[in-house]
Swiss-Prot record:
It catalyses: Endonucleolytic cleavage at a junction such as a reciprocal single-stranded crossover between two homologous DNA duplexes (Holliday junction). Mg(2+) 2 binds at residue 70. Binds 2 Mg(2+) ion per subunit. It comes from Roseiflexus sp. (strain RS-1). Its main location: cytoplasm. This is Crossover junction endodeoxyribonuclease RuvC.
Amino acid sequence: MTATRTIGIDPGTARMGWGVVEETDGVLRLVDCGVLTTSAELSQAERLLLLYNELRHLIEQYHPAAAAIEELFFGKNVNTALTVGQARGVVLLTLAQAGIPVYEYKPLQVKQALAGYGGADKRQMQEMVRLTLRLPAIPRPDDAADAVAVAICHTYAAPMIRRIEEGR
């Protein structure tokens, strides 16, 4: 009866969602989730440093065995894509320094894993997070629910990933 923890990350500079999901014998449980926030009054470098330090604290507190993060989606707003990319780089660096393997998933993969349908909207995804983890309410805020969703996606994919890695 081994418990495995996965931290899911929804990267962002102003708001970074995170969620820790634990799997024991096929049963998933939400350990904790939340959002790291930074003030717009800080410089970009100060915001990234704050995210780095806060993420390190979460890793020390929850001891995840793996991390899951959505692949970066390039929308029309180039500035948003750049700042999210910077936050994502901080996340990848922090996890690599801690020796935590990182698994990346496309938004479509996360939707298919949780809802069984790649066209699921945000509300449907949040409800599937609630149902999957048998929660009384949807995790809030939305950024935290998104992070929990990607952690669940990885938890579902992990057994197959292990088989593939063992076969190499």
